[in-house]
Amino acid sequence: MLVALCGGLLARGMPQHVVSLTGDGPNAAALERLGVTVHRLAPRGAAGSAVALLRLARLIRSLRPAVVQGWLYHGDLFAAGAHRLAGAPRDSLLAWGLRNSDIDHARYGRLLAIGRRLSGWPGLVVSNSQAGVDFHLAEGYRPRRLAVIPNGIDTVRFRPDPAARAALRRELGLSDEAVVAIHAARLDPMKDHATLLAAAACRPEVHFLLAGEGTLGLDLPANARALGRRDDLWRIQAAGDIAVSSSAFGEGFSNAVAEGMAAGLVPVATSVGDAGAILGGLGCLVPPRDPAALAEALRAMATLLAPARRAAGLAARARIETAYGVGAMAERFLAAWIAAGAVIGGGGPRTGGGE
C-alpha cells in the first residue's frame, strides 16, 4: 500500500523519499522503479538503532520534508524519535500510520505500550480502518488529530483479465468451469489458515489457491494448493472466482479482499477489522474462527450459476472502483496533512516515510 500511495502522490507532483528500516525490504525495488528515493537503514540491535535514529534525524534536517509520515509501529516510533532529534522542525509535520486493528499482545505489546505513551507527539495519526481507530483508542492512544483513510486499490492492475485467468488455470491444470477460491495471506496466526483449511476440507467441490509467504509448508487437503510468496497477485486473483479471507484478528483494511473484488471475484470474509465496510453488503461476511460458517458461505458462492457469480463479481469491482481507488487515497492523505498544518508547496522534497 505504501507503493500505491507514493505512486498516487508522485502523480500529483510530490517528490517522495522513503526510509526503509528493513534494508532492501519487499517494496524498495518497486518504489525505486516509480522514481522514489529509498534510504536504507536496516538497524540491528540497540547500537544500530541509535545510529539509524541519528541518520534519520540528519536526513530530516537536510531534506526538510513537509511531512514525516510513519508507517506501522516500528516506522512510527523511529519517525517520532528522529523528528525530535532533528529539533521537531515546525515546517515538518510528524504523522503516524496505523495499519492494524487488534493485535497479539504477546508479540506486539511492548511496541503498543511505547506507542501509547508517545501518541500525543505526532500532529496527525492516520488509520486505514475505523476498527484500527477504535482499538488504539481503547488501548490508551490519545492523538491530537485522527484521520481514517482506507487503503487504495490499483484497479488497473487488479481487474478481470480473461487471458491471465486462462493462462494460470492451464498452468495449474484447472478447467475454466472449476470454481476457484483465492486466499492471499502470509502464514501468520492472525490470518488463521487453520480455519480456512478446515472449511476447505468441507468443500471438496471448490479448488483453493493459497498465495503467501510460508504457505508451501502447510498440510493441505486434496482440493487446495499452496503457491508460496508471489509477486504477481494480480494474475493469481484474475484466475479465481471467490476471494476469501479467514483472518481471526488484527486486520485493519484487508487488501487481499479488496484486490480480489477489484479483479471481479465475489468476496467471502470474516468480520474482522473493516471487512464489513469493504464488502458493503456484497458477498458473505461470517464470524471469525468459525470453519462451519466459512464453509457454508463458500458453498453459497460456489453454487451460484456462473453468470450470476460473474455479475456479483462485477458489482464487487464497481464498489472498489467507486470507494477505494488509489487516487482517492492520495487525495485523502493530502487533505489530512494540510488540515493538520502541513504546508505543501514549492519544488523540493515534500514527504518522507518509514517502511
Which residues fall in each region the model found?
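Conserved acidic donor-binding segment of nucleotide-sugar-dependent glycosyltransferases
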Residues: 281-292, 300-306
